[in-house]
Amino acid sequence: MPLIMEDGINVDDLFGEPGSLELGLSPPSNAPIKGLPQRLDEMRLVGCCQKIAWSRLGCVAYITPDGMRVNVRHLQCRPSDGKWVLSEDTPLLPVTEAHGGHPLVHLCWNETGAELAVADSSGRVSIYSISIALNSIAGHRQATSDPDDDGAQIVGMMWLNVNRVVHAFHQAAKVQGRWAYSPFRRRPIGPFHPVNKAGLVCVTRSGTIRLLYQNPDSRWAEISTELKNTGYSDRLLTHAALVSTQGGVLVATHSACQKLCLYRVQIAWNPTQYDPGQQKPPAPWPVPSFRFLHCKVESLCDVIGTNRNPGDNQGLPSFTNSVYGLTRLDIILPALDNPAGSTSTPWIVAVYSSPLHATPDHPQQQSPASVIVRWQLDTGAVTLHPKFDEVGSKKSSAQMKPKLELRRLEDIYSDRYAISIDQIEYGNVLAITYEDGSIVFHDPKTMAVFNGVDDTNTVTSLAQAGFHYPPEASGLHMAFSPNACAAVMLDAEGQTQLRLTEHTYGAEGGLHDENKYSAAIAALTLAFCRGCGSDVNIDDVILILVRQLSSEAQINFINEVYRALSVNCNFTMEQDKLMNHIYIPRCLSLQAALGFKDKYTPRSSPSAIPWAILQLRHASVLYAFFFQYNKGAPTESHDPDVLRMVLGNTKWALEFSFYVSNELFDLADEFESMASDQEAFTQKLKSTTSLPLIILLSSMSRAFLRFICRGLRGIHAGYATAAPLTGDARVYYAEIYQTLENSPVRIDAYEKFLAGVDSAVRHAYHSAGFGDAERPGPEKELLVNARVPPVLVSAVATILRQTVPALKSEIDRITIYMGNYSWLGLAHDRRTEMYRRTRDVDIIKKIPLRSLGPYTEVDAAPSGKTNAQGPPQQPQPQQQRRRRCVRCCEISGDTHPPRSLLSFRMIAKLGLLRSCVCGGMWTLVEPEVSAPAADPPVSQATGRTPALMAIGLAGSS
């Protein structure tokens, strides 16, 4: 008797792998994708099985194929060539340790994108937070806090929203040939934690709803209760969907007996408000409790579409309900970017999938692979029998609560398996991803497919404007970037694949369609503005701009952004508004990023101007906060770390002013021969590219220079009245004072010079008849195109012929001329290029860092010793890590949170704990060997400021 494995029977077929049994059955026409059977089984068994997620801060977290680890990646600009790519994997070792070998099944980011929840197969949840970099995530809640119980497996999960109002944009509509954007303030949807801490709601397989929440001391606590079920068989849940609404948390559950239950749950806190400034321990912290308001039970769900009229089923395939199993359950909210508020009610979306392999009773050719079933959630009044009207008391009827109604909508059939449903672009688009890698965008209200040709005069989203994901390799898990410009897919091997959205930009069939091009630019503008208003990472938008738009199209986009965000570039009058303007740093960062080529190539002028203004803004805000934190009563002692940062920025600000002055002296000498020929002067000015000249002409950067001078005066005057200092604080403040005392340009002289420039610019505007309505145009020309507008040519002549010569008598020009400004990174000379290749400057502290190779140890002054003219140096350990900005590629030497409370408050107020001066996020990197320079580094001149003398460039952070 032959063995069962003989005669051509493949052992792999017994385990569901594709192949032929050679038993007379015709093989399937299309072999299933590797891993798809396991993925479908996983989606049927449990609702929480998301293996990859992209946070709003830009961090991609995914579970490895073995289910034991979590890795993180992120978008980054590569310093070597300026290309935007996906970073290398960084394993989160605390996750593996926390779950003790239990398979990881689900992960989810919170609304802000800073905290990550990870659940394992036993329902144990651990929580992590992005601390100082995208790949530096610290544990906050250990999984060991939860019991090891199969019934506690998570089938639904939702983070509580943050109680904050954000700026939103409804749409872009073309009015008289120009796009008009619809900004409004969007209020958050509760429930909220009264302390604005994190909260996580979970539904377990056994029908328990849990709330994990943080107390004011950042420790985690938990409450739980059972959902109201109609019977014991309903308590075994497979899926749950949760969403925050105005009336509480809406919960939809699906049980093993295929019943759909709907709950409305409120979270009540006692006390309802908590003020950490007034409540002192042992005052009670807010404690939550659950309250169930409504319950709705839907009977056994069928997927044939019984809601249709008999004639509607004609031509549709015939199949039975028993073939299908629920693989996805979601609650879809109306679009969030709606100035009128949420006018429509939520939808419940369920995906039912057929078995992957055909059976004799149910051939696969006769049934679709997936059926998307939808219900509209309506609220109706309770209708009583007329006899109740005869009852004298109407008290009971007056207090009756409205009932929930589920109205079934038209089903959607597909011959492909839907593996993911995501509501993206702030609720304006529903993206359905199929197993072959295709992504289809739908209107959430009507489920109509976006094709990008319906209306080129109104733009609500990227998908509606014609952006799409081209067909690529298949995958089993999908996550979209914060602004849906990119997506990351996990393939069958568990490898991440980056996918980018594309658009024709009006180039079709060799012709140019201006309407489609304009709509595409407006859609990208809308995505960028929504991200800025919601504090969402916008690196995915920059990635598309860099890869797909020409230089001319990028300029068009920048102009649209300035108009959409209503950024008035004219600050000749209202300069105080400049410091608190939330959109200006984002616009400047965008321009700087678009002009970045690589770490060693100078930026183009339209990129170098905003980059320099970002540095000026950083110093201005630093000085403002420095005085704010040290004028309380009683006055707090100055913090050494804060003073060190002030010292570095003071030296940078002074040297920047020297650099500007030196360049203007050279320009004045160059244009001196054309003093009597205005036409020749104008023509030469058109061909002249000077960053210092543009910086002085722009009212925005000129205002920041004035703020810096005000801050330097305050620091110099405050030295005499400062509280007694000791240790490093005394050393740093003394050096700040000496640096200002020995400056070749006095602060009052430079302020007088700025006043002269300001007068020349005002006079030029006044002479040309430019009022407040006309001035933003030339100011924007300075910022966006780095060109001197015709109206300011006379101002340049006045500055070079009168203002600059008046400054010469009040400065030490020899010292300024002999200075080496290569460390500023602004010039295009050979010395600056060599400095870029051999050294880094801490972008926050403005302190030059030592060059560290991967296995070198740099000699340093002993700890506590002070160089001749520099701050104390610390020994550098081997293989020291640093932080690099993923957007501008600049470096920070701090790889740990600030040590002191004052320093932490300062960095947090500046918004630099997790992000760079440009707004890009930090990533931890290993030290790299410096790029070789053609010649040895040029020694510093004798006129340098203290930190740039003695041992070259002082200070490592």
Swiss-Prot record:
Cellular localisation: Nucleus
Residue span of region Disordered: 855-883
Subunit structure of this chain's protein: Component of the Mediator complex.
InterPro entries: Mediator_Med16, Mediator_Med16_C, Mediator_Med16_N, WD40_repeat_dom_sf
Cellular component terms (Gene Ontology): mediator complex
Similarity comment: family membership: Belongs to the Mediator complex subunit 16 family.
Keyword Cell wall biogenesis/degradation: no
Principal location class: nucleus
Top-level taxon of origin: Eukaryota
This protein's name: Mediator of RNA polymerase II transcription subunit 16
Gene Ontology BP annotations: positive regulation of DNA-templated transcription
Keywords: Activator, Nucleus, Transcription, Transcription regulation
Function description: Component of the Mediator complex, a coactivator involved in the regulated transcription of nearly all RNA polymerase II-dependent genes. Mediator functions as a bridge to convey information from gene-specific regulatory proteins to the basal RNA polymerase II transcription machinery. Mediator is recruited to promoters by direct interactions with regulatory proteins and serves as a scaffold for the assembly of a functional preinitiation complex with RNA polymerase II and the general transcription factors.
Pfam families named in the record: Med16_C, Med16_N
Naturally occurring in which organism (per UniProt): Aspergillus clavatus (strain ATCC 1007 / CBS 513.65 / DSM 816 / NCTC 3887 / NRRL 1 / QM 1276 / 107)
